[in-house]
Amino acid sequence: MNAASDTSSGRENHLKKGSKVSPYEALIAGSLSGAIARGIIAPLDTIKIRLQLQIQGYDTYKGASKTFVSICKNEGVKALWKGNVPAEILYILYGAIQFTSYSALSKALSEFEKNNRNLFTISNSTHSLIAGSGSGLASTFFTYPFDLLRTRLAANSEAHFLSMSSTIKSIYEMHGIGGFCKGLTPGLLSVASSTGLMFWSYELAREFSNNYKDVIPFLEGFCGFIAGATAKGLTFPLDTLRKRIQMLSKTRDIDQNSIKAIQLCKTILKNEGIFGFYKGFSISILKSAPTSAISLFTYEYSLSAIKEFTSKHKKL
């Protein structure tokens, strides 16, 4: 049995080193995984963003549950889906690019290792870490403006909804085209690290769970949950930094000249302490772990369905 066909719960691990996934298969399955994951976790994302953006001395929200109640009471239940249009576009594009680039990088890395097998070998988990980090860089680079728009719209605490077009116009008038790239550098570092760690953790969890495949239902989702929690737990400060920079022009307590990530880090440490980087951490874990579980579960099942459909039609 080769690496690609090493299975858990009777299904192929399509993210394993050596797995054969075509670009169009990864594109379709990745888009579906992003769309479904976003639709389910949108309210948690809004709560997380509100908590992350709070500055010491202006704490409007006190914990995830009270934030939920406050938003529903003051803005209406629909407010939990503020920023959902750019976020849905973001998740669909991100999922498509992430899994397509992961598949391509995984294949290229396998070929490189094969051609240099006398010099070194790469473990399955390390392979996933490298390919995952690369896919995180690619997907973040191409979808970042939608991430920024999602943050701006979700952060709006007014009862009325901001339109995506008015937000785009406001950013452009205030900062020019460069305004859509605010926080890109910490964003690339944050997501590349988080994505690499997610795929790394997922591969380790899949390898470990082979011994328990008969007792763990929805194995892909279970392993995805562990992967999401691990990745977010290790990279959360970078995510907070990215969100703060994205909202810098609207933050009352931070000088506009402090746009550089290092300067902003110093400002947060000075005014809020180390815990300033961990605001919204609990809700972020509650959001990220299920998101990864749903995303990886949907991707694996979608690919299995696509391959089965393609196989049947080839026989006709």
Swiss-Prot record:
One of its GO terms (biological process) is mitochondrial thiamine pyrophosphate transmembrane transport. GO terms for molecular function: thiamine pyrophosphate transmembrane transporter activity. It is a multi-pass membrane protein. Its main location: mitochondrion. Signal peptide: none annotated. Pfam families: Mito_carr (PF00153). It is found in: Mitochondrion inner membrane. InterPro entries: Mit_carrier, Mitochondrial_sb/sol_carrier, Mt_carrier_dom_sf. One of its GO terms (cellular component) is mitochondrial inner membrane. Mitochondrial transporter that mediates uptake of thiamine pyrophosphate (ThPP) into mitochondria. Belongs to the mitochondrial carrier (TC 2.A.29) family. This is Mitochondrial thiamine pyrophosphate carrier 1. The lineage of its organism: Eukaryota, Fungi, Dikarya, Ascomycota, Saccharomycotina. The gene is TPC1.
